[in-house]
């Protein structure tokens, strides 16, 4: 389950978080072992206790000093107090739920039942996937933050802003950018 949860060929990895970092965080988080164990044999549901342990683990992946257990709260702290770019924040709680589902499908069902001759796998659609034409990850049930919260994007340019991340994404600079929106891209 650890391998699936932290990213593999069929489950996404966490932005800028490698296996080595995840392993170190796991070594200091005993309750996580029980959570991974609960999921490794194709559970029919993901318990609240297990989901909470995985959410706490995700918070620690992005901020090892955090006392919190909510990824949404960690996102707010990392963005407002530590100046992180949105692309380096942990996933939202809704996105993490879908990530957990995909990891359980891969690790618990596909790998967990690998020695079973005739597997009876559930539909991937029940475990964080969608199939408009072919199976692909369902990232979240929420609208994409970059689209619904454009005012939260920020660049680190101090002047003209022709090549900043805001301009590249075809967004205007805002007061949250280093240029304070006082540039040629506002």
Predicted segments with their positions:
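Non-catalytic nucleic-acid-binding/docking modules located in mid-to-C-terminal regions
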Residues: 1-186
